[in-house]
C-alpha cells in the first residue's frame, strides 16, 4: 500500500511538471562567446574569434553566415496554440571600409541551417523563389544597410520587422528616442557598438523593436512597434539565431553578446564583460576617400552623359520606328502620301482593339487623325514583293482622284518597308453585309435597300464610263459596300481595281476576286472586263433582295447552294418572289423586288454578251427602260459549277488573289 501511494505521488508530480514545463521560463545569456559554446552552431563564413566575438561575415564576397542556438525553443504549448511571450537583446557592430555593405538579422526559423538563403540583399534568409512564401515560417528583425527597391526599403540605414519576406511589415530609419522624445539617428555601418531589444507580448501580440548606442539604457519608446499575431508564423518548436550575408562589397559583422528568454524578459547583458572589437584604423582609407570624394563627382558627370545617351538612343529608335522609304518615282504622288507617324498615332499604334476586321490582304484599323480629328480607316496591305509596286501605287492614287458620291473616298496612302497602307474615309454604319445575313439585329427596309442598290449601280457606271479611264473594280460584293451616315451605299476597296483606256481591256490573265462573285468567263480566261463587274453586281442584287450569301451550305445535305442557281430555280417555277428576304415583311414594292431579282439573274448570266452594261442597269433601276424578257436565259443558270474550278480553297476565296473585305473599314466588323 505504501508503494502504491508513493507511485501515485510520483506520477502526479511528474504529470504536473509536464503540464508546467510548457510555460516554464527558458532563457540563455552569452556575455561574449569564449570559450566557444557547444550550444551555438555556426555555418557558412561565420566564426568565433579567439577573444569571444561572434563574427558573422568576413572578407569573402557573396557568402552567407549563420549562427543559431542549437536547441529548439518551444514557443507554443500546442501546434495550434498561441505564441508565448519572448524577448531578446544583443550587442552588434558593423565595420566596412566604405559605407556600402549588407546587414544582418535576428531570426526565428524552423531550421537553423536556412539552406535556401542567398547572399547579397537576401541576407542569407530567403532567395528570389521563396521570398514571401507563407510556408517559410520565419520571423526576423533586419538591420539593413542597403536600400532595395524590390523590397520597398525605407532607406539604406533602417530596421525592419520581417515575416516570411524581406518586404518588412514595418520599418524605420535606424535610431532611438531619448527621454524628451527627441529622435537621434544611428548609422549601422559605423564600426561602433549598438544594442538592440526585441520584445513580443503573447497576450496582446505587440512586437517592439528598440535600439540605442552601446552603454545607454533601453529607451522607453520603441523604434518600431506593431501588433501582429504570430500563431500562424511560428511553429511549436523553433530555432533562434542570426543571419548575415556579403555581396561584391564586403563587411565585418560582429555580435558581442546575446540574451534570449521565453515567458520572461531576457536577462540584461553584462556590458563590461563583453569582448572588445578589433582595433581598426578609422582614418579614411584610399578606397574610402575615393568613394567619398570622387564617386559623387563622377556620378554628377556620368548621369548627364547617360541621359544624353538614353535620349540619343530613344530618338534614333523613334526615327527607325517611323522611318519611311521614299523613292524618286513617288514625288509625283507627294500630296497623296501620308506620314506613317500620323497613321501610327491615329490608330494608337495599330493596337488590336482598333482592328475593324481582317481579310486576305491584311488588317483594317479605325483611326482618328491627330491634327484634323478626321475619322479614317487604315488598311495595311502586305507587299512581299516590290514588283509592280510603282504601278499599283500609281493606280491607287489615280483612283483616289475620282470624286463620286457613291464611292468611298481614298484619303491617301503610305508606303513603309514591305507594306502599303491605304487610308479611306471611315463609314460609321459599316458594311452592307452585316444588315443582310443570319437574322441581323438591324435590318434595312426595301426603300433603304433599293437606295443602296441604285447608289452602287451609279458608282459602277461612273467607273466604267464616266471617268477619264475605265476602272474595273474586280471585287464588287456586299462587304465592300459601305453605308455612310445617311445610309447611302458607297463602293469601296479598290485594292484589286485595274485601269485601262476606254475602248481597250486590261491585259491581265490573273484570276482575282472573291469566290461566289466570279464570273465563269473570268475564271475560264483570267481576263477581267466591265462585264465581270456586272456579273458580281448581279450577285449583289440577289444578296440584297434575298438576304442570303452568294454561296451557302445546306444544313441537311451539306451541299453548297449557289444563290444565282437558287433564285433561277424559283424563276423557272414562276414564283420568283418566293426568293425574297423574309425580313422584308409585307412593306415592300412587289414590282421593284421582282424587277431586282430578274435583273440580278440577267446580270449574272453565264454569257458575258447577254449581260447588260451598267448604263442599261441604271435605266432599268430608274424605270427609264423595260427589263427584257428573261425567257432566252440558258437553263444552265449562272454557269458557276462549284467544285469544277481549280484554285479555290475551302474558305471560298481564290488563293491567287483574295480580297480584303472592305466591310472591315467600318465599325460593324
UniProtKB/Swiss-Prot annotation:
InterPro entries: ConA-like_dom_sf, Kinase-like_dom_sf, L-type_Lectin-RKs, Legume_lectin_dom, Prot_kinase_dom, Protein_kinase_ATP_BS, Ser/Thr_kinase_AS
Residues exposed to the Cytoplasmic side: 316-669
A single cellular component GO annotation: plasma membrane
Biological process (GO), any one: defense response to oomycetes
Membrane-spanning parts: 295-315
Location of the Protein kinase domain: 350-627
Keywords noted in UniProt: ATP-binding, Cell membrane, Glycoprotein, Kinase, Lectin, Membrane, Nucleotide-binding, Plant defense, Receptor, Serine/threonine-protein kinase, Signal, Transferase, Transmembrane, Transmembrane helix
Active site feature: 475
Residue intervals annotated with topology Extracellular: 24-294
Signal peptide: 1-23
GO molecular function: ATP binding; carbohydrate binding; protein serine kinase activity; protein serine/threonine kinase activity
EC number: 2.7.11.1
Region annotation Legume-lectin like: where it falls in the sequence: 26-260
Cellular localisation: Cell membrane
SUPFAM superfamilies, per database record: Concanavalin A-like lectins/glucanases (SSF49899), Protein kinase-like (PK-like) (SSF56112)
EC top class, as a word: transferase
Consequence of gene loss (knockout): Increased susceptibility to the oomycetes Phytophthora brassicae and Phytophthora capsici and to the bacteria Pseudomonas syringae, characterized by stronger necrotic symptoms and higher bacterial proliferation.
Reaction(s) this enzyme catalyzes, per UniProt: L-seryl-[protein] + ATP = O-phospho-L-seryl-[protein] + ADP + H(+); L-threonyl-[protein] + ATP = O-phospho-L-threonyl-[protein] + ADP + H(+)
Amino-acid positions noted as binding ATP in the UniProt annotation, renumbered to this chain: 356-364, 379
Glycan attachment residues as annotated in the record: 58, 80, 127, 152, 185
Membrane topology type: Single-pass type I membrane protein
Keyword ATP-binding: yes
Function: Involved in resistance response to the pathogenic oomycetes Phytophthora infestans and Phytophthora capsici and to the pathogenic bacteria Pseudomonas syringae.
Family, similarity comment: In the C-terminal section; belongs to the protein kinase superfamily. Ser/Thr protein kinase family.
Protein name per UniProt: L-type lectin-domain containing receptor kinase IV.4
Gene that produces this protein: LECRK44
Amino acid at each position: 500500500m505504501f508503494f502504491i501511494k508513493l507511485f501515485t505521488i510520483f506520477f502526479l508530480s511528474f504529470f504536473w511538471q509536464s503540464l508546467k514545463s510548457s510555460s516554464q521560463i527558458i532563457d540563455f545569456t552569452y556575455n561574449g562567446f569564449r570559450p566557444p559554446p557547444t550550444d551555438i552552431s555556426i555555418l557558412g563564413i561565420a566564426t568565433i574569434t579567439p577573444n569571444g566575438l561572434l563574427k558573422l561575415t568576413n572578407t569573402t564576397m557573396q557568402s552567407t553566415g549563420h549562427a543559431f542556438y542549437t536547441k529548439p525553443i518551444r514557443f507554443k504549448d500546442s501546434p495550434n496554440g498561441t505564441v508565448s511571450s519572448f524577448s531578446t537583446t544583443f550587442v552588434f557592430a558593423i565595420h566596412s571600409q566604405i559605407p556600402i555593405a549588407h546587414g544582418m538579422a535576428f531570426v526565428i526559423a524552423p531550421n537553423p541551417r536556412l539552406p535556401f538563403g542567398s547572399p547579397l540583399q537576401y541576407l542569407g534568409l530567403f532567395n528570389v523563389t521563396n521570398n514571401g512564401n507563407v510556408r517559410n515560417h520565419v520571423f526576423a528583425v533586419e538591420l539593413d544597410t542597403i536600400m532595395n527597391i524590390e523590397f520597398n526599403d525605407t532607406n539604406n540605414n533602417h530596421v525592419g520587422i520581417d515575416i516570411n519576406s524581406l518586404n518588412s511589415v514595418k520599418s524605420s530609419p535606424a535610431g532611438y528616442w531619448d527621454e524628451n522624445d527627441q529622435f537621434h539617428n544611428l548609422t549601422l555601418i559605423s564600426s561602433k557598438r549598438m544594442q538592440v531589444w526585441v520584445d513580443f507580448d503573447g497576450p496582446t501580440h505587440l512586437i517592439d523593436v528598440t535600439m540605442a548606442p552601446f552603454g545607454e539604457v533601453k529607451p522607453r519608446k520603441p523604434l518600431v512597434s506593431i501588433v501582429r499575431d504570430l500563431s500562424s508564423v511560428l511553429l511549436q518548436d523553433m530555432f533562434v539565431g542570426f543571419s548575415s550575408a556579403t555581396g561584391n562589397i564586403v563587411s565585418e559583422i560582429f555580435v558581442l553578446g546575446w540574451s534570449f528568454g521565453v515567458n520572461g524578459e531576457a536577462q540584461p547583458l553584462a556590458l563590461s564583460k563583453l569582448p572588445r572589437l578589433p582595433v581598426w584604423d578609422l582614418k579614411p582609407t584610399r578606397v574610402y576617400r575615393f568613394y567619398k570624394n570622387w564617386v559623387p563627382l563622377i556620378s554628377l558627370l556620368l548621369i548627364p552623359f547617360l541621359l544624353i545617351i538614353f535620349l540619343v538612343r530613344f530618338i534614333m529608335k523613334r526615327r527607325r520606328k517611323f522611318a519611311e522609304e521614299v523613292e524618286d518615282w513617288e514625288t509625283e504622288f507627294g500630296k497623296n502620301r501620308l506620314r506613317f507617324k500620323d497613321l501610327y498615332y491615329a490608330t494608337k499604334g495599330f493596337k488590336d482593339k482598333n482592328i475593324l476586321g481582317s481579310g486576305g490582304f491584311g488588317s483594317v484599323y479605325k483611326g482618328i487623325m491627330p491634327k484634323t480629328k478626321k475619322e479614317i480607316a487604315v488598311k495595311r496591305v502586305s507587299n512581299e514583293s516590290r514588283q509592280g509596286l510603282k504601278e499599283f501605287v500609281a493606280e491607287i492614287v489615280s483612283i483616289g482622284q475620282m470624286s463620286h458620291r457613291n464611292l468611298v473616298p481614298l484619303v491617301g496612302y503610305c508606303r513603309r518597308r514591305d507594306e502599303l497602307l491605304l487610308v479611306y474615309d471611315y463609314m460609321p454604319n459599316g458594311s452592307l453585309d452585316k444588315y443582310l445575313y443570319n437574322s441581323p439585329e438591324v435590318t434595312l427596309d426595301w426603300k433603304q435597300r433599293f437606295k443602296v442598290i441604285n447608289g452602287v449601280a451609279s458608282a459602277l457606271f461612273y467607273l466604267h464610263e464616266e471617268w477619264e479611264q475605265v476602272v474595273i473594280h474586280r471585287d464588287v460584293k456586299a462587304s465592300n459596300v459601305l453605308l455612310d451616315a445617311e445610309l447611302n451605299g458607297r463602293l469601296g476597296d479598290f485594292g484589286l481595281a485595274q485601269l485601262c483606256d476606254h475602248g481597250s481591256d486590261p491585259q491581265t490573265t490573273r484570276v482575282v476576286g472573291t469566290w461566289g462573285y466570279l464570273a465563269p468567263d473570268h475564271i475560264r480566261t483570267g481576263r477581267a472586263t466591265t462585264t465581270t463587274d456586272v456579273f458580281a453586281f448581279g450577285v449583289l442584287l440577289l444578296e440584297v433582295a434575298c438576304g442570303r450569301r452568294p454561296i451557302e451550305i445546306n444544313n441537311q445535305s451539306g451541299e453548297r447552294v449557289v444563290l444565282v442557281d437558287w433564285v433561277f430555280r424559283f424563276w423557272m417555277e414562276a414564283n420568283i418572289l418566293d426568293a425574297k428576304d423574309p425580313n422584308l415583311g409585307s412593306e415592300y414594292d412587289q414590282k421593284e423586288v421582282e424587277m431586282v431579282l430578274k435583273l440580278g439573274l440577267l446580270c449574272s448570266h453565264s454569257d458575258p454578251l447577254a449581260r447588260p452594261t451598267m448604263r442599261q442597269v441604271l435605266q432599268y433601276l430608274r424605270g427609264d427602260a423595260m427589263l427584257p424578257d428573261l425567257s432566252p436565259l440558258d437553263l444552265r443558270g449562272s454557269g458557276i459549277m462549284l467544285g469544277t474550278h481549280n484554285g479555290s480553297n475551302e474558305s471560298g476565296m481564290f488563293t491567287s488573289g483574295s480580297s480584303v473585305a472592305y466591310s472591315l473599314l467600318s465599325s460593324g466588323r
